[in-house]
């Protein structure tokens, strides 16, 4: 019995030690040197623009994005932007942020990505809570498809009003 108990304890201690040595993320500066989250935030506070590159289907990057946003918003004015929103959906996004439509209304009005609720909604709702602007930064799909099929010259064929998106 003692043998089984000792094996059980050693097994779980090993798992705990292994789990502690595998962080969910590691941060590096521009020179490839590891930096702490605290140091990164201290440096980002001094910047006018912070661009956050992320993998669309990586929940850790979205969690980190929200954490950075919360820490920066506590220190300075912040404006958000995301390519998951297309520019022609800006008004619906503004209406949601202003409380004129519900989350369900936003879902009906905008072409949301499949991971919106889990990965992007927390950031959008944080912007809403802070009354911070949120910019729809992506080109509308129909124009992206047009360029993909016919090249950038195809944009010359669309009306000037359409180009305001």
Regions found by a protein language model. Give the residues of each.
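N- or domain-start disorder-to-order transition segments that initiate the globular core
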Residues: 18-47
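N-terminal, post-signal-peptide region of Sec/Tat-exported proteins
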Residues: 45-78, 84
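Bacterial Sec-dependent N-terminal signal peptides
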Residues: 1-23
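A substrate-binding/cap region within the structured catalytic cores of diverse enzymes
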Residues: 79, 92-165
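Short, basic, glycine/proline-bearing loop/turn elements
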Residues: 21-26, 48-55, 104-111
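Solvent-exposed loop/turn segments at secondary-structure junctions
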Residues: 55-59, 85-89, 140-144
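Solvent-exposed, acidic/flexible segments
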Residues: 33, 37, 58-65, 90, ...
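Post-signal peptide N-terminal segment of secreted/secretory-pathway proteins
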Residues: 57, 65, 69, 91-101
């Amino acid at each position: 019995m003692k043998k089984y108990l000792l094996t059980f304890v050693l097994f779980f201690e090993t798992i705990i030690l292994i789990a502690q040595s595998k962080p969910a993320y590691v941060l590096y500066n521009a020179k490839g040197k590891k930096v702490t989250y605290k140091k990164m935030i201290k440096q980002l506070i001094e910047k006018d623009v912070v661009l956050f590159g992320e993998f669309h289907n990586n929940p850790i990057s979205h969690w980190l994005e929200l954490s950075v946003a919360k820490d920066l918003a506590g220190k300075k004015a912040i404006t958000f932007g995301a390519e998951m929103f297309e520019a022609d959906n800006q008004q619906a996004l503004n209406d949601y942020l202003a409380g004129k439509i519900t989350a369900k209304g936003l879902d009906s009005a905008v072409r949301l990505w499949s991971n919106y609720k889990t990965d992007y909604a927390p950031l959008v709702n944080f912007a809403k809570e802070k009354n911070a602007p949120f910019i729809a930064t992506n080109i509308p799909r129909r124009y992206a498809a047009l360029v993909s099929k016919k090249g950038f010259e195809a944009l010359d064929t669309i009306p000037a009003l359409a180009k305001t998106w």
